[in-house]
């Protein structure tokens, strides 16, 4: 039999074992599509971002007009920009659903894969933040000022740290230049960490909805899941294109149509929708350092999830009490997202504080208790 180049060539061999002959569980559902969708999002963002960067000027006096120029005068510049801006939203939708899947089906018990995933989330958040600042609109300028200023809450070195990050005493030219450099660099770092994420995943193989070993029943990734992923991709690209072509500014802030003005503050400073849950948690604590710590904890709490797993079963498939708790957590996050977009006044303040409290309580206290309770009910 002639040797198969797919299995013998040093580079094709890696692709083959990762994407073609990879043994995959036969019963993984559409919730397992989001990994490949995230990879497609990353590719789309890098390509559209590169095309935008060729027409962008990282200068406070020119940034806003260079983006306007891209939209008006560059061939399909409006489409590239709309795809890039809304592509970021879809990136976050996919990553939140991907994390939700991991929580529901106990994928976090693959600790290395989970931890690299959390690092990926943090890097993505950093990338989105520095990118949002670049077009120098009113909201993005003030968002950058407020969020970077949070570092001044760090005792002793805080103020020095902020001025070092800004490159001056306010968000100005040096800030924009370094944010552009970071925004260009970080997606490639994300791509690198993604490869590590996959390497760890392929050590153990995919989890499945039953949470049991699937060694006895594996199928090749191609053609089964490659085709399933293409369907998922089509189902994601359709709403992305619909959004980019029909209502590209739906998720943006109207304040960003005004060029940045350091002398006037917008009435309600708020980040993009995908950061609102964390922003609501930040605002719910009436103390700067406390708020910053809660903000950090709201994402870093994911690193504790593997240690809070007390159930003898891996997934929530057959654990109705944990399921109820999971969907309460999901609803809670939606409430936090809504609160983050509202002004700081009654009744939003108290709703935000209650939602923030229940967010941490659910994860840190209720999940382990319910897990233990279910063990007892099932006589484990």
Curated annotation (Swiss-Prot):
SUPFAM superfamilies: a domain/subunit of cytochrome bc1 complex (Ubiquinol-cytochrome c reductase) (SSF81648), Transmembrane di-heme cytochromes (SSF81342)
Keyword Lyase: no
CC cofactor: heme b
Bilayer-crossing regions: 34-54, 78-99, 114-134, 179-199, 227-247, 289-309, 321-341, 348-368
Binding site for a ubiquinone: 202
Primary gene name: MT-CYB
Membrane-protein topology: Multi-pass membrane protein
Oligomer and partners: The cytochrome bc1 complex contains 11 subunits: 3 respiratory subunits (MT-CYB, CYC1 and UQCRFS1), 2 core proteins (UQCRC1 and UQCRC2) and 6 low-molecular weight proteins (UQCRH/QCR6, UQCRB/QCR7, UQCRQ/QCR8, UQCR10/QCR9, UQCR11/QCR10 and a cleavage product of UQCRFS1). This cytochrome bc1 complex then forms a dimer.
Name under which the protein is recorded: Cytochrome b
Keywords: Electron transport, Heme, Iron, Membrane, Metal-binding, Mitochondrion, Mitochondrion inner membrane, Respiratory chain, Transmembrane, Transmembrane helix, Transport, Ubiquinone
